[in-house]
Curated annotation (Swiss-Prot):
Any Gene Ontology CC annotation: extracellular region
Function: Myoactive peptide. Stimulates the contraction of the oviduct and foregut.
Taxonomy, superkingdom: Eukaryota
Gene Ontology biological-process entries: neuropeptide signaling pathway
Locations listed in the record: Secreted
Species in which this protein is naturally found: Locusta migratoria (Migratory locust)
The name this protein goes by in its record: Locustatachykinin-4
The keyword DNA-binding is annotated on this UniProt entry: no
A Pfam family assignment: Lem_TRP
InterPro entries xrefs: Lem_TRP
Amino acid sequence: APSLGFHGVR
């Protein structure tokens, strides 16, 4: 999973 940290995908 992508470590974006804003979509809740963290």
